[in-house]
Amino acid sequence: MIKRDIEAKIRSDFGKGKVVLVLGARQVGKTTLLNQLAENVERVLRINCDNADERERLSNPNTTQLLNMVGNAQLVLIDEAQRIPDVGMVLKMLADALGARAQIVATGSSALELANGVFESAAGRIFEYRLYPLSHGELAAQSGAERTEQRLLQERLVYGSYPEVVTAPNDGRRILESIASGALYKDVLSFGGIRKPDVLSRLVQCLALQLGSEVSANELGQMTGLNKATVESYIDLLEKTFVVFSLRSFARNARNELKRARKIYFWDNGIRNVVLGNFAPLTLRTDVGALWENWLVSERLKRLAYAQSYARSYFWRTTTQSEIDYIEELDGQIKAFEFKWNPHEKAKMPQPFAAAYPNATYSVISRESYDGFLM
């Protein structure tokens, strides 16, 4: 069983009288994480809110009912908590009633209803974590696995790192097809009020095709037949269900910097490729640069999240097409990174960026130098 980076951090939050909330896409390993957290705990109460009967136990309860349900449990595990009506109030009631006597851990695959409802009703009672598909660091940390991960790099760029894909690589495509046809959009369709799933699928395909490029809501609207506001709404839903994420353009000084541009990336390369139905090896692909960029950016953001870093992430581009793939800013320090799949391809800091940010650092990340960037 692959150990998740956030497990130890979650355990360190036990006994503080707070609800631990773990958000992440379906099938990234949240239930497995709950099982790991339950190891060596004598009295555990498990509630799976995908099950209607179990969900009913948390529908409009009073404090006495909650205390009777918990009984003498030391650990209360609530899976897929976003399906509980008024989930924030329920978690608040549990936290207030139990205090540090029992630890509550709730998971959810959607930030749509869960995070918003929780933070409105249970302010000050939540420690939040995000769980993503397996990270490069988690995979490389397995005993003797670092060289194995280097050898499997091309496979990761094509098939990604959902746990089941990693543990059953021969079935990778079939597993990803199953995720894409079922779990991927389940929460978007449930909570987003979307009546035309085919239009949503078309939008995701358009985002997949524009990987590594700036996206325009107007252009996406023309490609899908949606208006700009609906495109923006759907992208927001996809971000809140952990299918994609955005990077905004970095701009501080120069007049010609793009100030409102953004790129859309996928949290998992395999999901991006299954959306397009393309699992060709890298040697037969024309999108290697985009896959490399998506993998590095998503893996870097996983690392920052698990390290609980406050660094902010961007890309940089000017109206004259000078560009840098990835920018990080923390406490006034700016780090710039350029991504090159070919380790022999040269790159240097663009002169306009160097002039505008003379104290910034600049690094080139290739397939021979990425470990330090991700671990």
What are these regions (language model features)?
Residues K3, S12-A25, T31, Q36-R43, ...:
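A cross-kingdom feature that marks ATP-driven nucleic-acid transaction machinery
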Residues L45-N72:
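Short glycine-rich substrate-engagement loop in P-loop NTPases that contacts/grips substrate
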Residues D50, E80-I84, S110:
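Conserved Walker B
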Residues E56-R57, Q82-L91, N116-G117:
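Conserved ATPase-coupling elements of RecA-like P-loop NTPase cores
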Residues V70-V87:
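Conserved P-loop NTPase "ATPase switch" module shared by AAA+ and STAND
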Residues G88-L112, F119-E120:
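Conserved catalytic/switch belt of AAA+ P-loop NTPases
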Residues L112-E128, S143-G144:
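Short regulatory helix/loop adjacent to the ATP-binding pocket of P-loop NTPases
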Residues Y132-Y306, T318-T319:
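Interdomain hinge/linker elements that couple catalytic modules in large macromolecular machines
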